[in-house]
Amino acid sequence: MAPMYTSRVMQVFAILPAAGLGTRMAGAQPKQFLALNGIPILIHSLRAFSSVERVTGIYVAVRKPEIERVEAQIAEYGLADRVKVVEGGDNRQESVSHALAALPAENDDVVLVHDAVRPLIDAATIDRTIDAVQQHGAAIVGLPAVDTIKQVERTAHGALVISTIPREFVVLAQTPQGFRFGILQRAFAEATADGFLGTDEASVVERAGNPVAVVPGSQVNLKITKPGDLELAEFYLHQMANGQMTH
């Protein structure tokens, strides 16, 4: 008798590492908790993923002292049924690893990792990233470079230019960064075993030998790291609310 197979619906999970202290903002609290148009930056980001029907579950990794605070905010903004809070680690890679361990995922499921402080990500870009992961196994959102890119050498007297990198060979990595669960899990396991710490998830996956596709990004999808970034995000929100700008 031939074996019976059951079709399984692919799941999509989002992970938002939010355990950073945000020292460059020089504020009294981590930047993900700062208000953007009266709403915490983290909540803006969580709402964006919650609005995408294909996203099965959302996991946010925060420092242990912030867990109750984040759970209260999630409940206040009506996201408790979509978002789960896990304890983050000492760095981004550890926080993502903790969230990966909590996912009820299988190898072919999709995992999107997004900077908690990119609050203006739009649903269309999230959907395109999911599509790219289904096709390629791994994909990042990337913004084409418009400035001339120089490779430099650091010396005791400052930086010296050693070459010019053609712009067509460069993209500025944004998030979300998406992967098949199995690909990301194996790459993280290898990185942990080797003591490798990447600056983003794609660098860990690249190191494991996996190709990573690029989905077009947007300047609106900015990462809030400095005080001026918060002002720019507020400007973008105002422009979009008035119909003067789109993603």
For the regions a protein language model found, what residue spans apply to each?
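Residue-level signal for inorganic ion chemistry
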Residues: 16, 42, 99, 114-115, ...
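Short, conserved active-site loop motifs that form the nucleotide-linked donor/cofactor pocket
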Residues: 12, 82-83, 170
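Short phosphate-binding loop-to-helix
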Residues: 75-109
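N-terminal glycine-rich phosphate-binding loop and ensuing alpha1 helix
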Residues: 9-68
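Conserved core of the sugar-phosphate nucleotidyltransferase
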Residues: 120-215, 245-247
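Hydrophobic packing residues within well-ordered alpha-helices of enzyme cores
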Residues: 25, 70-71, 129, 149, ...
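Structural beta-sheet core signal
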Residues: 14-16, 60, 113, 138-141
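SAM-dependent methyltransferases
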Residues: 2-13, 19, 51, 108, ...
